[in-house]
């Protein structure tokens, strides 16, 4: 029987990417979609595959939401906080798929990344779990790249440095970054075109403008263009940022590990638009040849791509500009470190809006509609 699927937050950045992927994979032919809105209910809905969905339902109408077999939401944490418990208290037994982080660590939820933890997902469905939540973007991208090493239980611990895109903070942040870039360029455009000023004088002008009170920093609080921000999310009592705390907590929940795999590091915001990059130092449980490591990683899933550790391959294939908008998960800079034969270096890049956000939700929907 075709399931009725409610879609909430489909106009936003993650929701828009989700809808595009669903159209590309012809997912709408397998469901009866109902589109909801928090602010424009009653207005015309979208046109999907030449089918017009005329009326947007009220995303706060519990009675209508209760009619859904599945609800998939990219509306954000505030919506989840208000609606999810109310729905459950009103007896709704449907499946809830969520991009927001609120429910990730709840005992009655599963963090979804089926190429990595399909067995965990399948087991949870059989046990009656009905809440499925997308993971933190960097963690999902890490697991997609290193999934083979986790699957073969080779990882003792990981130290990670992230280089996270503006998209992870939201659409307004992306716009602010581009505005910052534009202001900095315009301030020295004439100097660059004429070539009459030294680069140091140009740099000095750029720096002064980025420090001025009129520079747009409403969203990031500080300049990101021509800079970086070595803190993401809130502050924890142990000195970690919450983004750094998620690394170990969410990874172990996703994998369903009995013994905790230690993961820690520093999360940094950079001027990339929508691709996160990560640098890993991995302590292996035993010495494994680099050739075998590459084979283990390569064989885990069809999206991961082992990049040869050469200058040319790295520059061409292991950058945000080469990965943005694709499902590819390149991993490179693979080499043993001077610390010993069990110490491995790796670097990976992935699209924050695809495998980092929308794609696990889409794939979870397909798992549920096939039940």
UniProtKB/Swiss-Prot annotation:
SUPFAM superfamilies: Glyceraldehyde-3-phosphate dehydrogenase-like, C-terminal domain, NAD(P)-binding Rossmann-fold domains. Its EC number is 1.2.1.11. InterPro entries: Asp-semialdehyde_DH_CS, Asp_ADH_gamma-type, Asp_semialdehyde_DH, NAD(P)-bd_dom_sf, Semialdehyde_DH_NAD-bd, Semialdhyde_DH_dimer_dom. GO terms for molecular function: aspartate-semialdehyde dehydrogenase activity; NAD binding; NADP binding; protein dimerization activity. The active site is at 137 (acyl-thioester intermediate), 276 (proton acceptor). Disulfide bonds: none annotated. The keyword Oxidoreductase applies. Phosphate binds at residues 104, 246. Signal peptide: none annotated. It holds the Pfam family Semialdhyde_dh. Keywords: Amino-acid biosynthesis, Diaminopimelate biosynthesis, Lysine biosynthesis, Methionine biosynthesis, NADP, Oxidoreductase, Threonine biosynthesis. GO terms for biological process: 'de novo' L-methionine biosynthetic process; diaminopimelate biosynthetic process; isoleucine biosynthetic process; lysine biosynthetic process via diaminopimelate; threonine biosynthetic process. Belongs to the aspartate-semialdehyde dehydrogenase family. Homodimer. NCBIfam families: asd_gamma, PRK06598.1. Catalyzes the NADPH-dependent formation of L-aspartate-semialdehyde (L-ASA) by the reductive dephosphorylation of L-aspartyl-4-phosphate. This is Aspartate-semialdehyde dehydrogenase. It comes from Buchnera aphidicola subsp. Acyrthosiphon pisum (strain APS) (Acyrthosiphon pisum symbiotic bacterium).
